[in-house]
């Protein structure tokens, strides 16, 4: 496994856990870091960035209430949710929960209430994938719970670039927390990305993902060394690994010392 830095000639070995990764300079499109960027892998809740774009493209009333239904309950992984069946929320709050807190019921309800229903939603997703040139991506449902939702780091960079053009998505995914009215009670929800709001991080887009099949995944748009950078890290074995590698990418791009962890020579990246 190697991580290639296209503009570097150094043979410095960077410990790197994710199985696939791609980091690019947004303005130039230049590849800064790359590892197995064309491998097709499950993407878990990174899916929700696509869900959000398709929902926003439909230009529905964001103040209209959505009632969480039994149909929205996860029957794939049987994941829990802090949004109870029967709760009614404005669509804008449902979108907030789907993106910031990665709530699966929220994402499912957005697809269910899409004009024409879930079938029309999936059709719109396929059209969006085609429009973005994401030829190696398959999305069959809105949450990412299905391991059939797959993509490549290369395709996900395209998705991140597109999502960065949606003000609602960038605002929501960079909120560290929010209070949402659930059945008359104010409930605090937090961003699944602990780097959001953390000192030293200038984050302009964020989404995490996890399933057993997908491992720990993250997409971020950050500012590093004066550049706007898109970072996609896929299939890390643990949150700590994913987070260490995200920090190492930022430090490396900023010419700072990277954090070293014990790693075999087969899991080192050459940069």
Residue ranges and their predicted role:
Residues 11-154, 158-167:
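Active-site-adjacent loops and short helices of periplasmic peptidoglycan-processing enzymes
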Residues 1-10:
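Bacterial N-terminal signal peptides
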Residues 15-19, 91-92, 116-271:
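Penicillin-recognizing serine hydrolase domain
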């Amino acid at each position: 496994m190697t991580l290639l830095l296209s503009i570097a000639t150094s043979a410095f070995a960077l410990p790197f856990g994710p199985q696939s990764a791609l980091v690019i300079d947004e303005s130039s499109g230049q590849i800064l870091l790359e590892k197995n960027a064309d491998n097709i892998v499950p993407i878990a809740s990174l899916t929700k960035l696509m869900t959000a774009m398709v929902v926003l493209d439909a230009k529905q009333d964001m103040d209209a209430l959505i009632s969480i239904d039994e149909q929205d309950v996860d029957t794939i992984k049987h994941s829990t949710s802090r949004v109870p069946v029967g709760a009614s929320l404005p669509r804008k709050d449902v979108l907030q929960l789907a993106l910031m807190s990665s709530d699966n019921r929220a994402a499912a309800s957005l697809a269910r209430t899409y004009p024409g229903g879930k079938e029309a939603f999936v059709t719109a997703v396929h059209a969006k994938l085609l429009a973005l040139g994401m030829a190696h991506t398959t999305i069959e449902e809105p949450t990412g719970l299905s391991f059939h939702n797959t993509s490549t780091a290369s395709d996900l960079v395209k998705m991140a670039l597109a999502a960065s053009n949606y003000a609602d998505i960038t605002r929501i995914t960079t909120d560290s927390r929010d209070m949402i009215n659930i059945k008359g009670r104010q409930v605090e929800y937090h961003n699944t990305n602990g780097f959001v709001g953390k000192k030293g991080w200038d984050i302009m887009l964020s989404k995490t993902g996890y399933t057993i099949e997908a491992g720990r995944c993250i997409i971020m748009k950050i500012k590093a060394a004066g550049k706007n950078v898109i970072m996609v890290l896929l299939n890390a074995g643990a949150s700590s690994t994913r987070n260490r590698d995200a920090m190492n990418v930022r430090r490396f791009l900023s010419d700072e010392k990277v954090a070293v962890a014990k790693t075999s020579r087969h899991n080192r990246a050459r940069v």
